[in-house]
UniProtKB/Swiss-Prot annotation:
Function: Catalyzes the decarboxylation of oxaloacetate coupled to Na(+) translocation.
Cofactor: Na(+)
Native source species: Salmonella typhimurium (strain LT2 / SGSC1412 / ATCC 700720)
Ranges annotated as spanning the membrane: 12-32
Reactions it catalyzes: oxaloacetate + 2 Na(+)(in) + H(+) = pyruvate + 2 Na(+)(out) + CO2
Principal place of residence: membrane
Keywords, comma-separated and alphabetical: Cell membrane, Ion transport, Membrane, Sodium, Sodium transport, Translocase, Transmembrane, Transmembrane helix, Transport
Quaternary structure (record): Heterotrimer of an alpha, a beta and a gamma subunit.
Name by which UniProt lists this protein: Oxaloacetate decarboxylase gamma chain 3
GO BP terms, alphabetized: sodium ion export across plasma membrane
Pfam families recorded: OAD_gamma
Family per similarity comment: Belongs to the OadG family.
Length: 81
């Protein structure tokens, strides 16, 4: 066989293989989209219920943490002079 014939057959095989892989990937994409649509159709996600705001929410989180931070600093300084 001639080297140009072998090169031509190699390119033919390469493009056929790449074409089959591309076709399979497109088929896989459409199958996954179809399954996703079927699952969403038969098992829809529940609508989230809005949560009510707490009645006595502190205005500032730092105001609640200030005594805790001060106690932690005092404890650290007492143990590590």
């Amino acid at each position: 066989m001639n080297s140009s014939v072998l090169l031509g057959e190699g390119f033919t095989l390469m493009f056929l293989g790449m074409g089959f892989v591309l076709a399979f990937l497109f088929l896989l994409i459409f199958a996954i989209r179809g399954m996703s649509a079927a699952v969403n159709r038969f098992f829809p996600e529940p609508v989230p219920v809005p949560k009510a705001a707490p009645a006595a929410a502190p205005a500032d989180d730092f105001a609640r943490l200030k005594p805790v931070i001060a106690a932690a600093i005092h404890h650290h300084r007492r143990l590590n002079p």
